[in-house]
Amino acid sequence: MNLLDNVDAASLRTDVPDFRAGDTLNVHVKVVEGNRSRVQVFKGIVIRRTGGGIREAFTVRKVSFGVGVERTFPLHTPIIDKIEVVTRGDVKRAKLYYLRDLRGKAAKIKERREPRG
């Protein structure tokens, strides 16, 4: 079992910022179209983080042209170029599935204030 942990540790990303459910992220995703490759930004609210180690994943939700779009990313995949935390959200749940049913201002998440010091 220790051998598997060593193999997993070699594959983990080191440039992952600290984020949790309720935070707004910019996820820079590499998209391959034919023989060309470009970077596409997916901006949305993290509604969940699941798993652990190499199998850890997170789901980001955004509303695009009135349609809710959710995308689940493995955290340690090479497809992700970088992750930026735009704002920190103040929520009391680890899974924010209730946002799927909310519209407009009701779906807005309060910003978490960091203590000075």
From Swiss-Prot:
The keyword Ribosomal protein applies. GO terms for molecular function: structural constituent of ribosome. GO terms for cellular component: cytosolic large ribosomal subunit. One of its GO terms (biological process) is translation. InterPro entries: Ribosomal_bL19 (IPR001857), Ribosomal_bL19_CS (IPR018257), Ribosomal_bL19_sf (IPR038657), Translation_prot_SH3-like_sf (IPR008991). Keywords: Ribonucleoprotein, Ribosomal protein. The keyword Plastid does not apply. SUPFAM superfamilies: Translation proteins SH3-like domain. NCBIfam families: rplS_bact. This is Large ribosomal subunit protein bL19. The lineage of its organism: Bacteria, Bacillati, Actinomycetota, Actinomycetes, Kineosporiales.
